[in-house]
Amino acid sequence: MKKILFMDTTLRDGEQSPGVNLNEQEKLQIARQLERLGIHVMEAGFAAASEGDFQSVKRIANTIQNATVMSLARAKESDIRRAYEAVKGAVSPRLHVFLATSDIHMKYKLCMSKEDVLDSIYRSVTLGKSLFPTVQFSAEDATRTARDFLAEAVEVAIRAGANVINIPDTVGYTNPEEYYSLFKYLQESVPSYEKAIFSCHCHDDLGMAVANSLAAVEGGALQVEGTINGIGERAGNAALEEVAVALHIRKDFYKAEPSMTLKEIKATSTLVSRLTGMVVPKNKAIVGANAFAHESGIHQDGVLKEVTTYEIIEPALVGESQNLFVLGKHSGRHAFTEKMKELGYEFTNDERDAVFEAFKKLADRKKEITEEDLRALMLGEAAFAAQQYNITQLQVHFVSNSTQCATVVLKDEEGNVFEDAATGSGSIEAIYNAIQRILGLECELADYRIQSITQGQDALAHVHVELKEGAHQVSGFGVAQDVLEASARAYVHAAGKLKSFIQLVK
């Protein structure tokens, strides 16, 4: 039975989702979780895009030990050399070079002839191979490329040294039958086919990204590309968790097994959702809140008698636990540390002390702590530690005529303290007005969302905000048991990002 490898592009293609703006620390958190998920290759970013992207890719490359780290690059020498500088420190570095091959792209975007495109492919892959042990070539807009020219371009790339050939459905145009036949055509028409691994990369514009990816596996693809939760620009990418579980459940049909640690799927999905602010729909396959819920009386009766009557996936398979209580206020440092190790978190002594202190404060107010609480706590403390500004004091009181007044005290990374007060028609507006006055911003609140981490009146709150000033839009989140504190943390998180970004572009 063939093993299917997964290339995750959440940190590159996924971050192109409107409103998603991850900082370096957040990208590293996702990369570490992708490593725990057993992802074979992670596309850490586009190193040549900006200095920020370069530094993020480099840090991930120098951190990840058990996965290949890859950077995207155009078929340009400067991009390829920049990618090399970013990932050369990785245990397993890879270059991902791409060039469009469809008539519409060659004519209107590239302004290149077919001969020019073939020459550029050969030169860029040859250069890449002189620097990297593994080179992946993508024929952008492959599904709208003339098949004979696509086969010619692929052959040139393999002869130049490409180890992996990606056949992307860049605009989500194809369907399963066409995509399957395209892979079969290349298998028959590319003389050097056996010298490379073929990969699929599907977008969801017509809602067929997962189905097309599975069709590609049937057609011979050994690598599937996509993102966690299917995030990405426009309608998104193929959701890797859906492809992986489909292959596992229907291995009798696909004769393939996913190379992924399936029990880490739920934790990975939750982390990506909270850091990006992109809510997972309740009815989403595999990771949605209703994925294992049964409302119909007939269905409930059947499941109670025999679970397989209506449930083809065991919740535990993807790490969907019953959220059992795991720790309490009497739990010590050793028990806490061991539980966090079990969940995949490793700390320095300073980090452990800070997170344990936050845990004890939560345990004093919350009767029982669940795994979801611990993950949220870790997420919130990591974001809090990486912020440019932190909240040291927050006070809200009623003034008159439904007006609230908020006093906020912030401390920056150098230890400088800033204090201001403001009013608003509600507590949250007053808090946000005070923070704006301190940071000197004139931004607009583009989005505000709140969700409960777990059930119960003492549950942790997770608040997501999006701020917009001119053409700049960023997101931030905050986690706390108190809604106002979580809201303030989220605003400071986003506002710090916005202030830094505005200063950078100036």
Curated annotation (Swiss-Prot):
From the UniProt record, which GO molecular function terms apply?
A: 2-isopropylmalate synthase activity; acetyl-CoA C-acetyltransferase activity; manganese ion binding
Q: Which SMART domains match?
A: LeuA_dimer
Subcellular location(s) of the protein: Cytoplasm
User: What Pfam families does the entry give?
Assistant: HCS_D2 (PF22617), HMGL-like (PF00682), LeuA_dimer (PF08502)
Region of interest (Regulatory domain), ranges: 390-506
| UniProt-listed GO biological process terms | L-leucine biosynthetic process
Q: What CDD domains does the record tag this protein with?
A: DRE_TIM_IPMS (cd07940)
User: What keywords is this UniProt entry annotated with?
Assistant: Amino-acid biosynthesis, Branched-chain amino acid biosynthesis, Cytoplasm, Leucine biosynthesis, Manganese, Metal-binding, Transferase
Q: Which family does it belong to?
A: Belongs to the alpha-IPM synthase/homocitrate synthase family. LeuA type 1 subfamily.
Tell me the function of this protein.
Catalyzes the condensation of the acetyl group of acetyl-CoA with 3-methyl-2-oxobutanoate (2-ketoisovalerate) to form 3-carboxy-3-hydroxy-4-methylpentanoate (2-isopropylmalate).
The name this protein goes by in its record: 2-isopropylmalate synthase
Q: Which organism is it from?
A: Bacillus cereus (strain ZK / E33L)
